[in-house]
């Protein structure tokens, strides 16, 4: 399969990763952002390796295939920028310091960035499975069975109780919630890493690169002066002909840099938006993890149904004896992805289990199902 085919397959796989066991902010990172990066990568792959990313002005001596050879050579071996106001080319020993070494590698960088955005998601998928909990499967079961009349009670009881008591017996009531926070922290750290990666890759003098380039454009300081993503550059090429070596300095048009500039400016501001949104989301979930009033308040909201004891004492009892932090996380994710009706229905099942089998809470759910 071709490289483009592999990238397309990868993009399709990434966009199907979501199992509704996270939040919309999480999906903005590993689904939306990854899809954007893959789309830009495909665009630049097509421009660089199918179209004509560079065209060079060549002397009359370059007949036949020499022009194509020169353009391919210059694209591979880098070019260097000379401001338009400089009438002479720089000295040969200083040209290497002016070289642009990024434009050939931009599509590959975008793929690497997309992979980085998938790492936190992979951690969230893999790690909880080792403890016997699969949040995605439980939420899917609750959503599907919540729409059915036959067998809904049994399925929801299974979803409500499976592994929560096992975790309590091991003394771990917060393992999955902690794992979820680690995943969010990894997302946040990845976004910060993206800024350093862009600055290093593009070799820019600006700390806040995207804002600096944008401000230059607003103030009329374009690439001819700043040297950022220049459309015109120079390339030195040596040609051996009849035993002699001829040195040529060619002027080339880097059409692909017009795309690179717009893509990277967009990505910088997109990453800035993600940083703010993800940081805010992380703070909210840390508060939900460690603030007792937040946990009990959420449980009370779900208990506020007819025929159910929705006293603070009952909410505290359900939290300590049945749900713990992992159970609250599951209910919050179900509430976020499936709506309040499903989460209230599931809480009602949990309440009925705790009331009807209050002396049997330590019995595994399989034994409880058998005794029925």
Curated annotation (Swiss-Prot):
TM region positions: 31-51, 106-126, 181-201, 263-283
Any one GO cellular component localisation term in the record: gap junction
Subcellular location as annotated: Cell membrane; Cell junction, Gap junction
Keywords attached to this entry: Cell junction, Cell membrane, Gap junction, Glycoprotein, Ion channel, Ion transport, Membrane, Transmembrane, Transmembrane helix, Transport
Gene Ontology MF annotations: gap junction channel activity; gap junction hemi-channel activity
Domain of life where this protein originates: Eukaryota
Membrane topology: Multi-pass membrane protein
Pfam family, one: Innexin
Glycosylation sites recorded in the entry for this protein: 352
Statement: the UniProt record of this protein carries the keyword Iron: no
InterPro entries: Innexin (IPR000990)
GO biological process: calcium-mediated signaling; monoatomic ion transmembrane transport; regulation of defecation rhythm; regulation of neuromuscular synaptic transmission
Homology family: Belongs to the pannexin family.
The protein's role, per its UniProt record: Structural component of the gap junctions. Required for signals downstream of defecation clock.
Full protein name: Innexin-16
Organism per entry: Caenorhabditis elegans
């Amino acid at each position: 399969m071709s490289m483009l085919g592999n990238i397309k397959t990868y993009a399709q796989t990434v966009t199907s990763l979501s199992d509704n066991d996270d939040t919309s902010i999480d999906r903005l990172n590993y689904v939306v952002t990854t899809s954007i990066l893959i789309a830009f990568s495909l665009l630049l792959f097509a421009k660089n390796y199918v179209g004509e990313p560079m065209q060079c002005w060549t002397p009359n001596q370059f007949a036949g295939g020499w022009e194509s050879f020169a353009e391919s050579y210059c694209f591979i071996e880098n070019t260097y920028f000379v401001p338009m106001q400089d009438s002479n080319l720089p000295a040969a020993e200083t040209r290497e310091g002016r070289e642009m070494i990024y434009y050939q590698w931009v599509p590959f960088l975008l793929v690497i960035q997309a992979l980085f955005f998938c790492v936190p998601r992979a951690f969230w998928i893999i790690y909880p499975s080792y403890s016997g909990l699969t949040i995605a499967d439980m939420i899917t079961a609750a959503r599907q069975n919540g729409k059915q009349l036959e067998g809904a009670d049994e399925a929801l009881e299974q979803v409500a109780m499976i592994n929560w008591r096992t975790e309590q017996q091991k003394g771990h009531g917060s393992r999955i919630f902690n794992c979820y926070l680690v995943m969010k922290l990894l997302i946040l750290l990845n976004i910060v890493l993206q800024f350093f990666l862009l600055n290093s890759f593009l070799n820019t003098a600006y700390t806040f690169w995207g804002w600096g380039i944008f401000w230059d454009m607003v103030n009329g300081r374009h690439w001819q002066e700043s040297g950022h993503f220049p459309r015109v550059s120079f390339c030195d090429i040596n040609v051996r002909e009849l035993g002699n070596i001829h040195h040529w300095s060619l002027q080339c048009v880097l059409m692909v840099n017009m795309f690179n500039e717009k893509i990277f400016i967009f990505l910088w501001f997109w990453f800035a938006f993600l940083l703010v949104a993800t940081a805010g989301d992380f703070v909210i979930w840390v508060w939900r993890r460690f603030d007792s009033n937040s946990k009990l308040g959420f449980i009370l909201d779900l208990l506020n149904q007819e025929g159910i004891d929705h006293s603070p004492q009952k909410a505290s009892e359900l939290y300590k004896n049945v749900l713990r932090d992992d159970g609250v996380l599951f209910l919050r994710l179900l509430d976020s992805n499936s709506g309040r009706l499903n989460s209230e229905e599931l809480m009602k099942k949990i309440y009925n289990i705790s009331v009807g089998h209050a002396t049997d809470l330590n019995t595994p759910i399989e034994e409880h199902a058998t005794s029925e």
